[in-house]
A protein has these predicted regions:
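Juxtamembrane transmembrane-helix boundary motif
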Residues: 1-9, 13, 34, 63-156, ...
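Alpha-helical transmembrane segments of multipass membrane proteins
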Residues: 14-15, 31, 35, 59, ...
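Juxtamembrane transmembrane-helix termini in multi-pass membrane transport proteins
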Residues: 20-73
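A helix-boundary/kink motif common to multi-pass secondary transporters
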Residues: 21, 25, 39, 69, ...
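Transmembrane alpha-helical segments that form core, pore/gating elements
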Residues: 141-182
């Protein structure tokens, strides 16, 4: 029964990616951990492949509709993808099984990664829901370029650490620095998620035993969801999309924090 629920969750992952341009991993990691019973390390690796492949199909559809800013996608993807690969290939395998202990209290690696995941989600949601001050577009602001590139590198490290495609981090950055309208930010986010996720997954392949049968089936179901989501997105306005995305990320972060702290 739980397994069937998990596959319905796969459709929901694609649906959310199609509507909001992010949030796939916010669903994928909890579904894989809490419903499909994978450990968080394996779930984060699988999440990168599922979300990356699903986003690739969404990117192709958005490209045909001219809802992608290619130059911005490259500028944002390049520094973050370096951070993702370094983290998945070198940093994750080096994190000890017990990250912290004090007396009888122990913080396992898996719990630590889920807590980091939830905290980053919470902060990104608050950023999305707050009213933004006007900023100079990234491509026109030479003084801010280096700072933004450094920030995106660390975004890549966070994406790699928590096994997320990073849409919930990338979309706020696209809105703030690139000044893209929400629907174009969604399309551009999907191509950045594709690059970040699949490069991150390559860093996992040598360190993880992959159940390809399960992974490909789950991903195929998620791809169906993204086509449904892209269809629904056409009928939603920009402000509503932004609010839906921010509230969704906020709610999921609170659920994961509660689950990890009190379970």
């Amino acid at each position: 029964m739980l397994e069937i629920l998990g596959y319905f969750g796969a459709i929901l992952i694609g649906l959310v990616l199609g509507i909001t341009g992010g949030g796939g991993s916010i669903l994928a990691v909890p579904i894989l951990v809490y419903i499909m019973s994978l450990n968080p390390i394996m779930a984060s690796a699988y999440s990168l492949f599922i979300v990356g492949t699903t986003s690739a199909f969404g990117s192709f559809q958005n490209f045909k509709k001219k809802l992608i800013a290619p130059k911005t996608a490259f500028l944002f993807a390049f520094p973050s993808v370096i951070g993702v690969y370094i983290t998945r290939k070198f940093i994750i395998p080096k994190i000890p099984d017990t990250v912290f202990y004090f007396g009888s209290f122990q913080l396992p690696k898996e719990t630590f990664l889920m807590l980091v995941f939830a905290i980053v989600m919470f902060m990104a949601a608050i950023s999305m829901l707050k009213e933004k001050k006007e900023t100079i577009p990234f491509e026109e602001n030479n003084k801010s370029k280096f700072a933004v590139i450094v920030q995106l590198f660390f975004v890549g490290i966070l994406i790699g650490l928590i096994g997320a495609g990073g849409g919930f981090l990338i979309i706020p950055a696209l809105l703030k620095f690139a000044k893209l309208p929400m629907k174009k930010a969604i399309g551009t986010s999907l191509i950045i998620i594709t690059i970040n996720s699949l490069i991150g997954f390559l860093g996992d392949v040598q360190n993880t035993i992959i159940d390809w049968g399960f992974l490909l089936l789950f991903t195929a179901i998620s791809v169906i969801g993204i086509f449904i989501g892209l269809y629904i997105q056409k009928y939603l306005n920009e402000k509503l999309l932004k609010k839906i995305f921010g509230i969704f990320v906020l709610v999921m972060s609170v659920i994961i924090l509660y689950k990890e702290i009190f379970s």
